[in-house]
């Protein structure tokens, strides 16, 4: 199964991100926007894993989750990968993400022991859409600039989730396989 490890975002943040997607729209570029219910912060993309690996990963995540406290983060601003001149992914930034960075690093280190490739530099973000092609580079840049410091609200990071991703012609369908609450 295709899987990843993620943090879920609140309903109010989802609403704000959908409004940003609507604002960006599709006039300046053909963008495949992420569905509202699929917004998340990826801690690690795993790719194809077996049931056995999933069980190993669950044990690791359970152990890691207990070490960190639930905490509030703020979702603010729009960024792009790889760079503003060549926009492929549009994302919302996450502020106050020091704990998330630590969690991601620990997951990365632990899973490297199981043979997963190490990620390197982690940027906490919520993907809004993937750009297929740009029709009006300047127009798109202007819209993204206007959202550069937009506040999308805050939410409490409560758990780490192991998610399964099933690719369909309509887009991916995510299913939570296991959820590990952070400590109070």
Swiss-Prot record:
Reactions catalysed, as given in the entry: a 3'-end 2',3'-cyclophospho-ribonucleotide-RNA + H2O = a 3'-end 2'-phospho-ribonucleotide-RNA + H(+)
What SUPFAM superfamilies does this protein map onto?
Answer: LigT-like
Q: Where is this motif: HXTX 2?
A: 125-128
One GO term in the molecular function aspect is:
2',3'-cyclic-nucleotide 3'-phosphodiesterase activity
The record's annotation in Gene3D superfamilies points to: Cyclic phosphodiesterase
Residue interval(s) of motif HXTX 1: 40-43
Could you list this entry's UniProt keywords, alphabetically sorted. Hydrolase
Q: Where is the active site?
A: 40, 125
User: Keyword Hydrolase: yes or no?
Assistant: yes
Q: What is its EC number?
A: 3.1.4.58
Give the InterPro entries listed for this entry: Cyclic_Pdiesterase, Phosphoesterase_HXTX, RNA_CPDase
Q: Where is the signal peptide?
A: none
Query: Into which EC class is this enzyme placed?
Result: hydrolase
Q: Which HAMAP family does the UniProt record give?
A: RNA_CPDase
Query: Tell me, what does this protein do in biology?
Result: Hydrolyzes RNA 2',3'-cyclic phosphodiester to an RNA 2'-phosphomonoester. In vitro, ligates 5' and 3' half-tRNA molecules with 2',3'-cyclic phosphate and 5'-hydroxyl termini, respectively, to the product containing the 2'-5' phosphodiester linkage. Ligase activity requires GTP, but GTP hydrolysis is not required for the reaction, which is reversible. Ligase activity is weak compared to the phosphodiesterase activity.
Q: Which family does it belong to?
A: Belongs to the 2H phosphoesterase superfamily. ThpR family.
Instruction: Please give the name of this protein.
Output: RNA 2',3'-cyclic phosphodiesterase
Species of the source: Pyrococcus furiosus (strain ATCC 43587 / DSM 3638 / JCM 8422 / Vc1)
> What does the organism's lineage look like at the top?
Archaea, Methanobacteriati, Methanobacteriota, Thermococci, Thermococcales
């Amino acid at each position: 199964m295709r899987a990843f490890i993620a943090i879920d975002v609140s309903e109010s943040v989802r609403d704000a991100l959908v409004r940003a997607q609507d604002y960006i729209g599709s006039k300046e570029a053909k963008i495949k926007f992420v569905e509202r219910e699929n917004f998340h912060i990826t801690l690690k993309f795993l790719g194809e894993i077996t049931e056995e690996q999933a069980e190993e990963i669950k044990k690791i995540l359970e152990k890691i989750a207990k070490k960190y406290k639930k905490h509030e983060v703020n979702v603010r601003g729009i960024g792009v990968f790889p760079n503003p001149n060549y926009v492929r992914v549009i994302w919302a930034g996450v502020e106050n993400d020091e704990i998330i960075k630590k969690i991601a690093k620990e997951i990365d280190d632990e899973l490297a022991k199981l043979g997963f490739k190490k990620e390197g530099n982690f940027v906490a973000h919520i993907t809004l859409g993937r750009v297929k092609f740009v029709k009006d580079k300047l127009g798109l840049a202007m819209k993204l600039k206007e959202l550069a410091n937009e506040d999308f609200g805050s939410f409490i990071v409560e758990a780490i989730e192991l998610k399964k991703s099933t690719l369909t012609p309509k887009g991916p369908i995510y299913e939570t396989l296991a959820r590990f609450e952070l400590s109070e």
